[in-house]
From Swiss-Prot:
Disulfide bonds: none annotated. One of its GO terms (biological process) is mitotic intra-S DNA damage checkpoint signaling. This is Cell cycle checkpoint protein hpr-9. Disruption phenotype: RNAi-mediated knockdown disrupts hus-1 localization to the nucleus. May be a component of the 9-1-1 cell-cycle checkpoint response complex that plays a major role in DNA repair. Residues 355-370, 493-504 have a biased composition (Polar residues). Putative component of the toroidal 9-1-1 (RAD9-RAD1-HUS1) complex, composed of hpr-9, mrt-2 and hus-1. It comes from Caenorhabditis elegans.
Amino acid sequence: MQAIHENYTDNPSSSITRERQHEDMKGAQFVVQSNLKIMSRSIAALSKISEDVLIEVSEGGLFFKTVNRSKFCVFRFAPEFFNACDVSMINKKAVNICRLSMKSAQRIFKGVAFGEKNFVGCEFRIDPKAERMMVKLQMNYDIERTIHAKLREMGSMLHKPTYNRSGCRNITVVFASTLLPIFVQMKGDIEVTMKVTDDGLTIRNFHSLDGVTMFNMGVEKGAKKVKTETTITCEKLTRHKIQIPVEFSFSIKEFLSIVTFADQLGSEVCMYYDLPGKPLIVSIEAHPNFDIELALATMGSDDEIDLDGGILKETMAQHEEEEDKSTAHSSSSRRKSKAIDTSSSGTQKSKKCSESLSQEETTRSQSLPSRNRFVPEIPVAEQSWRDREVTVYEQREPSPDLQIVEEVMEIDNQPIVTRTIKEEHSVEQAMQDVSIETIPVETPEENIIPVEVEMLEEPEQEDQEIFKIPQPKRRKTAEDDRNRKIRRILMGTETTSKMRMSQQFDKRLGPLVSDTQYESR
């Protein structure tokens, strides 16, 4: 076989002219070499948030954004992040934003995301007004791969979400390695609930309510069961500044993607949040060359939060009043306990009693858990006056006035009268004086009235009939009639029709036949 070589010097092909046209295309140019893996991991994290990625070019660098009704995420790459950056060919006064499909972006960085060593660098040529974006991947052995990704149309102008980190009153900073094992176990759920107090964070998820309908919605809502609950103490948190204890729910899928990205870099995760209904802002701020920010919508119970913020001032004012009342009440209780100690007799029993009373009083002064989650304690004014009452249990000696005098009851001993029989009269003489005669009493038969005794057996029979089990009736068959006739013949009770015993076993005659029929045969 002979190889055929063609010379394109005189007649250049259309492919070469297209390459020259793309090389001469206008737009911003970005070259990444050392931070190529970070760029590919950012695309992998954004792929779990939205189906499209918005690419914005400005003097501040390159921005990757995803927008949705409930979430907003942005990756900001400064000019120092790239090995080379040229933004002089774009219109700086206009908004330079283009939209790229997430499937196309994943396809471009497919090999880089898996950590292949063949990729050396990447070059972007982005013109927001053009129809395509050129990506040139530099590989080992002087191999270059050029990709022309088609851009999508911008349906509407992008409105910047209105939120601010400085407006959030609660801040928590924690390493991603601490959060990742907790959220990996809950990744099968749609949302999780986070409760924040001064002691730390409590993250929990609940069993799914698949069988909830409009008929059993109220029952299932009250029967919400906790599936997993994890508490992170303040010792494991880098920074934990809480002004208002809150509890809210948020989506776990987007939050987990940012936490996974931070864990790959070994950096911290900063969380800015406020009342339920305001966004939860998750950011990574440890690296000077790039910044990541995710704003998630939060949701709380309908009974505990007012989105206008009117309830916040009331709860804060009540909380301050409760603290003042609790301090005043604790000081008064201490004075009472001191008075009890001084009034005691000084024995060991009284000291132990006073100590137990002071402990009981402090436990009573502590308020019960509140229904409102923003206020951890019930106001002291709502407690009953019996909770403030102090009772002293001391053993007192009985007063002489109250002593009961035990008096012995006296019984009058009546004299026993004894009569002595005179010796003059003996028993024999007394028997002779008394004559005993037996007088027979005749009872005439006429005067005898016969008494008839009737046994009341009817109610017993009725009871027996009630509880009597009916026996099943048996159907009469031809064999029963035949056996009855045979029984009558043997007993001699059958006079009309007589039968011979041999007829029972005579097959020629067939069934049983009377004597008259047998003689005729």
